[in-house]
From Swiss-Prot:
Pathway recorded for this protein: Amino-acid biosynthesis; L-arginine biosynthesis; carbamoyl phosphate from bicarbonate: step 1/1; Pyrimidine metabolism; UMP biosynthesis via de novo pathway; (S)-dihydroorotate from bicarbonate: step 1/3
Family to which the UniProt record says this protein belongs: Belongs to the CarA family.
GO MF entries: ATP binding; carbamoyl-phosphate synthase (glutamine-hydrolyzing) activity; glutaminase activity
Biological processes annotated in GO: 'de novo' pyrimidine nucleobase biosynthetic process; 'de novo' UMP biosynthetic process; glutamine metabolic process; L-arginine biosynthetic process
Region ranges (CPSase): 1-168
This protein's name: Carbamoyl phosphate synthase small chain
Length: 357
């Protein structure tokens, strides 16, 4: 293996072995605390443009299979691992972790201290980083990193460009794709929903003309304020159709109702985040992947907070007081992670049924 460098914006440099595609890339450095589920995480479009560090000490031990993709074309910039398994084994495995990264043109680095990287990000917040081949021109690479401006509106490159159906016999649901995970479609299909997936910039009029029973606002990457057209669409359809928002969809729904969002210091990325439902006191362990959150300060009168994160008390769910609409910051579809909150899809079914009465 050739040597590769991970250069952080604060000047810290980590040297390790090359993994995956032979590319030099720059992105936002984040970390994920999950112990498994690396395939689902890498193929989650919410990691668009990010260099994903796995805190678990060994990654790739069960290879990659055809069933656990959350999107076919992953858009994360690179992966960072302490150790990439050299002898993976699983009955579903189709290729190794390294083969998968090469097939998807994703570079990586192995043999670095991921605990130290995570500590830096926790203390100083998410930052830019570059993954490059080890050369003698480190100062030049550092100056290039400092000068790089990361792209905005990553939803545009994560969303479908054309509408497509996923037919079934039940409730008609329009799924607005901001970078959706396939597991959301699976959960809705399990409930026999007749789905139409549409691009992120689909207008309210186009959605209303489809006469759906409900609208799903999916997860996706980046800053929700970069998608003003979606915020306007939500303003126009709420009250007319039941709405369920997840992750970025939750943030967009909140913005459409006058709430504010903010960039978190290092975000929530993992599968063990405890969330409390305020009405019942119920605790769910949830899968999360977000760097922005809805502010609890000066929350609009029309919204009520339904869920909070146990560790930092951040907003994890809201419900509209007058319209049939609610949203959560976490992923009730899991994939990977616990299925504690999958009942929320059933709540969405009930919301649609009651609205028709």
């Amino acid at each position: 293996m050739s040597k590769r460098l991970l250069i952080l914006e604060d000047g810290t440099i980590f040297e390790g072995e090359s993994l995956g595609a032979n590319l030099d890339v720059t992105g936002e450095l984040v970390f994920n605390t999950g112990m498994t589920g690396y395939q689902e995480s890498i193929t989650d479009q919410s990691y668009n443009g990010q260099i994903l560090t796995f805190t678990y000490p060994i990654v790739g031990n069960y290879g990659v299979n055809r069933d656990d993709y959350e999107s076919i074309h992953p858009t994360c910039k690179a992966v960072v691992v302490h150790e990439a398994a050299c002898r993976p084994s699983n009955w579903r495995m189709q290729m190794s972790f390294d083969e998968f990264l090469k097939a998807k043109n994703i570079p990586g680095i192995t043999g670095v201290d991921t605990r130290a990287i995570t500590k830096i990000v926790r203390e100083h917040g998410t930052m830019k980083a570059s993954l490059v081949q080890a050369r003698d021109e480190v100062e030049h690479q550092m100056s290039q990193l400092q000068a790089t401006v990361l792209p905005t509106n990553q939803v545009e490159t994560s969303s479908t460009t054309t509408a497509y159906p996923s037919p079934n016999t039940g409730r008609k649901v329009v799924v607005v794709d901001f970078g959706l995970k396939h597991s959301i479609l699976r959960e809705l299909s399990k409930r026999e929903c007749n789905l139409t997936v549409v691009p992120y910039n689909t207008s309210a009029q186009e959605i209303l003309e489809m006469e759906p029973d409900g609208v799903m606002l999916t997860n996706g990457p980046g800053d929700p304020t970069d998608v003003p057209e979606a915020i306007e669409m939500i303003k126009e359809i709420q009250g007319k159709i039941p709405i369920f928002g997840i992750c970025l969809g939750h943030q967009l729904f909140s913005l459409a109702n006058g709430a504010k969002t903010y960039k978190m210091k290092f975000g929530h990325r993992g599968f063990n985040h405890a969330v409390r439902e305020i009405a019942t006191g119920r605790i769910d362990f949830t899968s999360q992947n977000h760097g922005y959150a809805v502010s609890s300060e000066n929350l609009p009168e029309d919204l009520m907070i339904t869920h909070v994160e146990i560790n930092d008390d951040s907003v994890e769910g809201v419900r509209h007081k007058h319209f049939p609409a609610f949203s959560v910051q976490f992923h009730p579809d899991a994939a990977p992670g616990p299925h504690d909150a999958s009942y929320l899809f059933d709540d969405f079914m009930d919301l649609m049924d009651n609205f028709k009465k």
